[in-house]
């Protein structure tokens, strides 16, 4: 049986390797060559690409999809869809899910890999049904993980539930690289033995087991696998396409792909990747810590980046050790977007504040309340009681609690566009959906769609040289220099030669607040993380009780409620919505 290959170079490869920064201008020159290979599909959209396009790159993600479809008409295009979360970080009403899928199909999408971070089939149902109703390929997903709560029967039951919902195929998504070769063989064998379904396997290379897992799955009868072109593979990413093609050549599983065509593509990306060196993670080789922490590749690079922004890069090992503990408290949920971000952020909070759950992120509370769906086992009862505050957890499908919201969203976006003088796209619904998924970031993108200066600068293939070089450095050292407004970290040897040059971590979007509480004025309320003030809730002179929410901080793409550690009167509010703050900055005081 021939094995179908899905190459993830245009989506998950760069999401895992360099924080989803690959630009459309670096995709289109190689698109015709990719289209000529004969892949089963090309993953090129969804996941974090939508967010990255509008947050960092200043690209319209809908335009990206149309351009890729135009450039690659022969190969099915594939995306990753987060079920009821779509591409955002909350559940959306069914009418929004239906319209989003419709527009994705109209813009060129063929294959939808639909997953739910909780492995709750109820959260995948609306999206899967919408995909099939619009004539596209609906692929249900098992988000693979291990824990005392997960057995072979867990995956067989979920497979059966997805088949009852209605799917065209099923993917096993090993986002952390923890699927062992023998477990892959058993899982694929047992699913194939019991069900007539096309089966696909997605693995990450982070722990070093992915290539072996793919081979054992192929022996067991898997129909297709994900790989990435070699120059965009390995470490946080995926097994190399060429290696698997060569391995299977001449066997009953021969992929039929031409390795010379693949090598030309690899050569192209080998050069393109150099532009994005500033966003690369630190991993060299494999990382066995993932076998314990179960952190997906993309999450690991994001954690490194986010800890740098918090001036806490040295805390990575502590955070990795805390992640499994948080995961257990949250019912052994899988670590895949958005739960990976939620667990990671909570672990960072627990480490940086020096006290577990001193601060509970809004999204962590949502999982404890049941707002994201069923957890594999019950969550920590004490934590749940703390966030419920006497209320009851959600037990139904979370989206059943949501009223239709598309009409209201559309009216709101059109109103804001008129007020701000924004020209909406020809198909205005695409812009409406962009803002629906990312209200603040989406609106900012629409305001600056034709203003590249509002986004990250274009990546540079060649490292810039300092404007001036010290005539005679006193000794070797590491310095930060600014070149054309961009900061670079430079390592200078004893002889004055520059042996390393990388982009420095960007600063917060605006000048951080630097406020200090006057002596004796009360107890300062400080920022546990670096980020931006989302909303100030407390008012000057207000009397608050212990546990009352004072303000909401946006950090690491999550909203963190800052609560009063004691009863008191609010004095000296030092921040407003939109302000950037650093760790430890005083936000207000409680007298």
From Swiss-Prot:
EC number annotated for this UniProt entry: 7.2.4.2
UniProt KW keywords: Biotin, Ion transport, Sodium, Sodium transport, Translocase, Transport
InterPro entries: Aldolase_TIM, Biotin_BS, Biotin_lipoyl, Carboxylase_cons_dom, OadA, PCB-like, PYR_CT, Single_hybrid_motif
Enzyme class at the top of the EC tree: translocase
Keyword Translocase: yes
Annotated NCBIfam families: oadA (TIGR01108), PRK09282.1 (NF006761), PRK14040.1 (NF010643)
Protein name: Oxaloacetate decarboxylase alpha chain
Organism of derivation: Salmonella typhimurium (strain LT2 / SGSC1412 / ATCC 700720)
Gene designation per UniProt: oadA1
């Amino acid at each position: 049986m021939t094995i179908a290959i899905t190459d993830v170079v245009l989506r998950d490869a760069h999401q895992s390797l360099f924080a989803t920064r690959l630009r459309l201008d670096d995709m289109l020159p190689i698109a015709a060559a990719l289209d000529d290979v004969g892949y089963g599909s090309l993953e090129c959209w969804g996941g974090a690409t939508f967010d990255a396009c509008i947050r960092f790159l200043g690209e319209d993600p809908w335009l990206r999809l149309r351009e890729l479809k135009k450039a690659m008409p022969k190969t099915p295009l594939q995306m990753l869809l987060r079920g009821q979360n779509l591409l955002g970080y909350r559940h959306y009403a069914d009418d929004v899910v239906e319209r989003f899928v419709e527009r994705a199909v109209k813009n060129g999408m063929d294959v939808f890999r639909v997953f739910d971070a909780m492995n709750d089939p109820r959260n995948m149902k609306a999206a899967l049904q919408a995909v099939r109703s619009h004539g596209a390929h609906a692929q249900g997903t098992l988000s693979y993980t291990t824990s005392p709560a997960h057995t072979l029967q867990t995956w067989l039951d979920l497979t059966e539930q997805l088949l009852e919902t209605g799917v065209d195929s099923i993917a096993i998504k090993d986002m952390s690289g923890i699927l062992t070769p023998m477990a892959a063989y058993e899982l694929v064998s047992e699913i194939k033995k019991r069900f007539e379904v096309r089966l696909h396997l997605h693995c990450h290379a982070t722990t070093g087991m992915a290539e072996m897992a793919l081979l054992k799955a192929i022996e067991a009868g898997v129909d297709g696998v994900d790989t990435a072109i070699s120059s965009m593979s390995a470490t946080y990413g995926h097994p190399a396409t060429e290696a698997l093609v060569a391995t299977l050549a001449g066997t009953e599983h021969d992929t039929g792909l031409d390795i010379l065509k693949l090598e030309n593509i690899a050569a192209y990306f080998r050069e393109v990747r150099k532009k994005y060196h500033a966003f690369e993670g630190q991993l060299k080789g494999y990382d066995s810590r993932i076998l314990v922490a179960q952190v997906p590749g993309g999450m690991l690079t994001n954690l490194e980046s986010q800890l740098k922004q918090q001036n806490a890069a040295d805390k990575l090992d502590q955070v990795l050790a805390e992640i499994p503990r948080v995961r257990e408290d949250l019912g052994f949920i899988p670590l895949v977007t958005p739960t990976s971000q939620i667990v990671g952020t909570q672990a960072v909070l627990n480490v940086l504040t020096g006290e577990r759950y001193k601060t509970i992120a809004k999204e962590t509370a949502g999982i404890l309340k049941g707002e994201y769906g069923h957890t594999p086992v019950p969550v920590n009862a004490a934590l749940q009681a703390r966030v419920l505050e006497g209320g009851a957890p959600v037990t139904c499908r979370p989206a059943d609690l949501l009223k239709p919201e598309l009409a209201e969203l559309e009216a709101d976006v059109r109103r804001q566009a008129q007020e701000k003088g924004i020209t909406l796209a020809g198909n205005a619904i695409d812009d409406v959906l962009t803002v629906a998924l990312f209200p603040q970031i989406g609106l900012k993108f629409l305001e600056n769609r034709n203003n590249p200066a509002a986004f990250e600068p274009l990546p540079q293939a060649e490292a810039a040289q300092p404007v001036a070089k010290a005539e005679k450095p006193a000794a070797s050292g590491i310095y930060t220099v600014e070149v054309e407004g961009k900061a670079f970290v430079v390592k200078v040897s004893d002889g004055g030669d520059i042996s390393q040059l990388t982009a420095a971590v960007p600063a917060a979007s605006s000048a951080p607040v630097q406020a200090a509480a006057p002596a004796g004025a009360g107890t300062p309320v400080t920022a546990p993380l670096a980020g931006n003030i989302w909303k100030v809730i407390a008012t000057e002179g207000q009397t608050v009780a212990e546990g009352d929410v004072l303000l909401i901080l946006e950090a690491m793409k999550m909203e963190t409620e800052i609560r009063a550690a004691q009863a008191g009167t609010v004095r000296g509010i030092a921040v407003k919505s939109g302000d950037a703050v650093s760790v430890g900055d005083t936000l207000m005081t409680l007298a």
